[in-house]
Each structure stands twice: as C-alpha cells, then as structure tokens.
Amino acid sequence: MSENGTVRAMWTDAELDDALSALHKETEPPSADVRATLMLACRETPPKPRRRYTWAAATAAVAALTAGVLTIPGAPSAAAEALDSAAAHVLAEPDPRPGPGQFFYTSTRESAMASSMTSTGKPLSLLEESMTQLWVPAIRAEEWFVRSGQTGARKWLVGNEDLARREGDGGLLDPRVSRERVQRGLCGDFPDQRELGGTPDDGKPCGERYGHWEAPTPRFLADLPRDPDALYERLSKDAKGRGADVLRLASGVLRAAETSADLRAAVYRALVKLPGLDVTDNAANLDGRRGTALGLTEGDLRDEVIVDTASGRYIGRRSVLVKPGTGYWAGLQPGTVVEFTAVTLGVADKAGTPPAN
C-alpha cells in the first residue's frame, strides 16, 4: 500500500510503470511500493533537480533526521543475532487474527523527500508526511476501507519556504497533492485502481487473487516457503540478486497484517543470509518507536528495515544518504534520512476506527 497515498493492492511492477506514465499531474500519490521502485532508480543515476514527483510523501516530526548512521563493528554477526532474536520473539507472541465482523488494521505513516530548483537554479528539498490507514475485513470478499493523504507536516532539508516563495518552488509546494481521500471497495477494489487501469486479478473471485510481494494475498503468503534457505533463494531470485530489492520485497511481507508469525520469523531468518547486511542500534522511526535497523548500502543510499527485536515486531524502514548530495540530492549531507516509514498493525472492531491499543 502507499505509505504516502492510496492502496495499490494487486499490481505488478510493469503495470505500475505503465500506469504511472499515463498519470495526470493531479493524480493522488502512488503507493509505497511504486515510490520505492522510483527511489531505486534515483540511486543509480541521480537526476538533475527538477519538479517534485507527485508521489513524494511527507514529514515534520522525525527525530534526528540528519543524525549519522553508525555501523557497528562485526555487523554481520550482530545482524544475525538481532534477526534470530526477532524471529524467536515473534513466534512467542500471539498471532492476532480478526474474528467475525472485525478487521485487519494497518497504519502506514511515511515521510519522503521531494526535490526541485528555484527559478535561479538553487536546490530545494523537503520531507513531507503522509498517512494511510487500511481496514481489511476478516472475510476478504467483504468491503474494505482506506483513508489516505498528506498530513501537512513538512521539514525543509535544503532551502526554506521563504526562498521557495520568493524565487519559485518548481512545483514543490503544489497544494493539489495534499488532500485526504477515503475509499471503500469489495475485496479491496478501490475506485483509484479502476482509474489506473485495474489489476491482473480483476474479475477473479476474491479468494483466487494472488497479489505479489508488496501487496500479498493469503494465497501468495501461503505459497512462500517457511524454510529460511528456500525463502532467501526465492527473495533473491525475485529481486534479481539486488540486496536493496531483497529488503524491499521482504518489507512488503513484514508490513502485511495477514502475514502469520511463522512466516515473519522465516523472513527474519532469511535476511540473515543477505550479504553485506549490517546493524545500526537504537534507530528511531517516524513515530518515535525505537528498534534495531538492519540494512546495506548500494550507491548513494543505505536501505534499512527497523525491527523491535524484543517483540519481533516490524516497525518500518528508512533510506539514508551516505555520500554528499549531488543531482537530485543536491545540498544534502551524508547521514540525511530521505525516506522513513512507520507501520502499525492490529485488529480493529470497526472500519474507519483504529484499534484501541
């Protein structure tokens, strides 16, 4: 789902790319999986500063956004220890499942960077925050409910609002992307999906839909191996061997409310096998919850998943710039967080109302 916009329940990467190319500039920001794909493209060859991407999400309440990332000596063994601890604890926790009339609940709060230039060529970058809340009924064929949109929270990284107003913001402060949107749909068939051309599972009975890593259905989750070696092999194959994509695909399963405890544990243990994975302790996420950040560096960015090893709960993910910023990242210092996502899972009694705890 979008951590900064609406839910995209059953899209393949190719279809998302096609849909994005046809989007009007007033379209709602796409989902987190779409934005993640775009972010990965940026890291290889950073584009010149330009008009904001309409998918850019938001933040203003991130603690220590530009704090440096500390890599701990002996990180591979530290990563294995942290992931094994998370796996053991998640198996010891009850596996929450909604009863009749209840809902799986997922709250995704995201901040991501948008970048542009003033009319005089000065770089501008800011973080904006978006919020998506999703309620999926215990019987998936029934009506789903999603509320999404930007919160209005904003933090400048390069430049400021006065400069943007005085010399032009290049579309960075476009108010049209800030509205909240509420949608309902049987089996997650939301109106925005039809606007973008539908999904590969359109027309199929709800129980026969398959989904993919970043929008998994019960069928997809059931087909994933629980053996860590086999699961890592599947992750690596589908990620085409790229470590950052392994983390992205694994995160799609970890943030899904319907993922069972045994599969979460298997994902943690599969990530132990990811070459180059290391640890940053005491990493704060968007909501201020603290956990262990496990990640790796490719190109200009360090990608991390953040886990509460004491409970096994997946907290979120973040991307950190590791080199002095150029191009799209112009003016940013190493250690700047350019994307940050926090996920909260639970069981709700009523669509539109978050769980009490």
Positions of the model-derived regions?
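Intrinsically disordered, low-complexity prosegments and terminal tails associated
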Residues: 2, 63-357
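N-terminal export/targeting signals for secretion/compartment entry
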Residues: 1-88
